[in-house]
């Protein structure tokens, strides 16, 4: 008996029984090796869908997608000439949902487009699930296009808009996000706390904390009650912008409103105290957190360990790591990276390397951050052989050196006057497909200037324009200082004026060195003009420069300038 005939007999049996029994017959035939036809599969899907058995239909489709049930149905459904007797909308809806659940973005889109082409529209739940998948998969532009194409056809709800607003905020498209907020109201829907919290969080992450504050106030006018996450993201936003008073006030407002701070809120507070060097206050908040019964995760401990390391309290930091183990948590790679960074900062490379070996033996894998931290540590203590050994090891672990890795090495070789080696690292960086940035060039130029190689430094400086890179204030000040050391007052003054015309303010050292060199070269008028420029920039001349200027004024015959003017 042929497979198609067996499938036909199966259909005749399934049509006589309820869908649950029909599915059992279908599965039994599958396990016995029956090669289903598109008609037998279409029948059981239609039988399940028409009875409202969506989960069972979706499970069956997932088996088709994975190949556990061999069939050409999925391919045939996308062919225009294939028209089986099915309830199309539920079928396509279920297929799209199945692909979404299996994270098959392209296939989900294929069936969605075919569904629309056939004149069918997905249900709200399917549409929302697909939008979520697209945004999580970094396909925001596709999600935006589909949303606008179907917004007048699909029954949208507040969740639909919330998904898209979150996508806008994550992609930095705030104009679109606020346009969606207005559109939501045009559709007769009311924005909820989650939508406003999403917008507040987005504004804070992109530095517009005042707009976030306005949204928070608008929530109050609308009668929306902020949740712990709303307070936390705004509090964190204030802290990130250096607005400590506002951040702490937000924390107090949260408690006054009767809302118990969550772990995120406490972590923000602890982090702010640690960043400000107030580790004792951070530990008081930590104690309060535990008293309130809020679970302290590894992240909380990592923040405190980082604060202790920045305060050079390494003994306490190590004790806290041991405490992490005692409370049933495990130090993660971030914990080790913080400790390694702390010990590298103070040149304790033996301890840093011991921690590095410890993390590997505990089953953790070093990250690019781990290697860069250790390479920077070795470079700081001038152990370039150790740094290069680590580069070799990271490559063996299939971790490619990054722009930061190469910049650290270039800086180290240039500072130690290994110019050829620094240039070799620069060349390797470009060969690996990485594009050096202004900071990379600044460390190379700095190394050349420090060792008096102004000819090469000047060539590199001029090449920045050819690469469409704008020199920053660090590069200008470095070059000016280099020319002053060389005794070239003309070049130093020219660069200083160029820097000012570019909208940058030279630092005190650049002004002082150039004025001193001009005086040495008896270019009194230029020195006096530059001094006036320095004072007008809001910079204070040093005592030695003050005395030098008096000498300049005596030579020029100008005795009218008051000491007060010099000290302003």
What residues fall within each predicted segment?
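N-terminal targeting peptides
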Residues: 1-159, 168-179, 183-194, 206-214, ...
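Pentatricopeptide repeat
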Residues: 3-7, 22, 37, 41, ...
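Alpha-helical solenoid repeat scaffolds, predominantly canonical TPR units
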Residues: 25, 60, 111, 146, ...
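Inter-helix linker motif
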Residues: 33, 68, 84, 119, ...
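C-terminal interaction modules of eukaryotic adaptor/scaffold proteins
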Residues: 504-505, 510-568
